[in-house]
Amino acid sequence: MNDVGNIQWFPGHMTKTKRLIEADLKMVDAVVEITDARIPESSRNPILDDLVKDKPRIILMNKCDYADENATRLWKQYYEKRGIRVLTCDCRSGKGLNRFLPEVKTMLADLIERRKKRGMIGKALRLMVVGIPNVGKSSFINRMAKTKKTKVGDKPGVTRDRIFCDCEWCGHKFLLVDTGGIEPNIDDGLLAHMREQ
């Protein structure tokens, strides 16, 4: 499948991104990938599939209210056929995010059970949050934290340092790990299209 985006990844960006993701993958239990539902494939990091491999992952197709409903459904089916869990949402309003933590709990059920048997019930599940600028990653983290943990703005890459965010759902603790500094070269027209509504 294809969409209409035009994002260029240069060797320097690729190297930096790969290093950041590889470092964080070692300390997390799963990956949360934020994309723009209007251009889901173009708003993905192209090296993520190779890096994540067998690590549990969920894609949040953000800004779903601005996307074509039929196209979103087809993209959701496309990713699910590849074994990736998908939720549609709007991170700024919170629409659809009530399903996120229950979905993560289901996705990591085996890990939760193993920890329970080891007496590690209170150990937080660690989730790495990834997404290129302007897909709504900061809005997602702020919404989950119920407070403003990260800066939200139109300038690409406003989140530059690793940020840790604690959240909880039905007694289960979650630690969101946001790796900053991932800045591809985004076409100006596409960037304007992707900016927060």
Model feature map: region roles:
Residues 2-29, 35-51, 68-74, 158-164, ...:
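Switch II of P-loop NTPase G domains
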Residues 13-16, 119-122, 145-172:
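Switch I (effector-binding) loop of TRAFAC-class P-loop GTPase G-domains
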Residues 29-35, 53-65, 84-88:
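Conserved beta-strand/loop subsegment of P-loop NTPase cores
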Residues 65-130:
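Canonical P-loop GTPase G-domain recognition
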Residues 127-142:
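Glycine-rich phosphate-binding P-loop
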